[in-house]
Amino acid sequence: FLLNLSINRKLPKSDGFRLYRNNESELYLCSVFFKYLVFIIIPKILNSFFSILFSPRETRYSVAYTYHQNHTKLLSQYIEIPNPEGRFLADPFVFAYNENNYIFVEDFFYKDNKGRISVIKIDGDKNEFLDVIIEEDFHLSFPFVFKENNEIFMIPESHENLDIRLYKCLEFPYKWKLEKILMSDVSAADTLVIKKEDTWFMLTNICSSKSIDHSELHIFYSDNLKSNAWKPIASNNLVIFDPLRGRNGGLFYHNEKIYRINQVHGQAHYGKSFNVNEIILLSKNEYIEKE
């Protein structure tokens, strides 16, 4: 090359930009593309095609329950609550009141593509749908219900209204009123609150990217449940960005331990499964959980 350059006093003619320099590399590229086409693209196209042909036109969920002590019952042994016509039930939260058990649910109406909050009374293998108890001009879901100082509160998801709102029960289980807007101008989903000593912690799902999958777990704290100035825990504490762990699914207490349920989302599959995580540490400075 250098000898030719010294004799001709010019660079050899270029064939133009080439990502690969020889036929062997080009064959490898074709092989990779073929495998990608066969194993990724074509299955996706076929899956979408068959989904359109054979899947139900409308998304449907349902709620089921059971009684047990050791958390070992199979889902097939649960009692399914029938969906009302033209609707589906989702996001169940169980609440005990005066020796009776109630399930608060998202009650989604297909006719206006909007969820309300409804309540069902359960008694053994019998269940009674009571009524829609909270309805707004926007979608509501995930009715996280809890008790504090003999008062009953609920934080339903209201991300369409760009806020996090606290409702107070005036007459159980039917009558509720909006007590406080805890956060404004935020698209947050599936909010939970935990009280530890004199501090309230809010675990909620927000997307930093402004998308609507709400896959990040953000944690705030306040000394007052009804505050509208919640602060994030220490800035050096990492928010959970993992879509396989971030999204809240519920909360329960067992043997003096706190457990957070998280939803697991697959590719184009909302609510593929769930995990149970023990909350090891929750403070103004740090959050640690283990599966």
Regions found by a protein language model. Name each.
Residues F1-S25, L29:
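Donor/substrate-binding cores of folate-linked one-carbon enzymes
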Residues C30-E291:
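Carbohydrate-active catalytic/glycan-binding domains of CAZyme proteins
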